[in-house]
């Protein structure tokens, strides 16, 4: 299972998240005309360290979640649920062993053309390959 697939499965296993967004969590971008609230997720980059023997097998990915809703309050509510699920986590996401998942940034975003509001969260995730 890939890191992003495992992340999606883990986030959507949370009752609060699914009560707010159902299973509307999409790779990279929302579909055309989405039902809100919804989450788009993407890997921004992955850093792999090396030692004298080669790769250390503990990559760190920066993953961005864009949490979209029709109102600021709804975006903030879902963002809080997602952050509560992910921030500070270590353990297993299915077959993926996560050493740490830390929320390292959060910002507000709005789209004046559509009236949508978002909270964008950045996570640094270290896992074992």
Residue ranges and their predicted role:
Residues 1-55, 73, 77, 89-97:
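Small/polar-rich, solvent-exposed N-terminal microdomains that initiate assembly or binding
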Residues 62, 79, 101-104:
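Solvent-exposed, well-ordered amphipathic alpha-helical segments
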Residues 57-70, 75, 82, 117-127:
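Oligomerization/assembly interface segments of phage tail-like spikes and tubes
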Residues 84-129:
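Acidic-leaning, charged glycine-interspersed low-complexity segments
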């Amino acid at each position: 299972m890939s890191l992003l697939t495992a992340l999606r499965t883990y986030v959507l296993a949370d009752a609060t998240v699914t009560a707010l967004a159902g299973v509307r969590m999409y790779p990279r971008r929302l579909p055309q005309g989405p039902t809100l609230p919804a989450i788009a997720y993407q890997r921004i980059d992955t850093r792999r360290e090396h030692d004298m023997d080669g790769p250390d097998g503990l990559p760190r990915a920066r993953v961005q979640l864009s949490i979209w809703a029709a109102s600021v309050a709804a975006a903030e509510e879902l963002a809080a649920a997602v952050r509560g699920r992910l921030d500070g986590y270590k353990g297993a996401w299915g077959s993926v062993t996560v050493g740490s998942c830390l929320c390292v940034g959060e910002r507000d975003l709005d789209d004046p053309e559509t009236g949508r509001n978002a909270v964008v969260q950045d996570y640094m995730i270290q896992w074992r390959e």
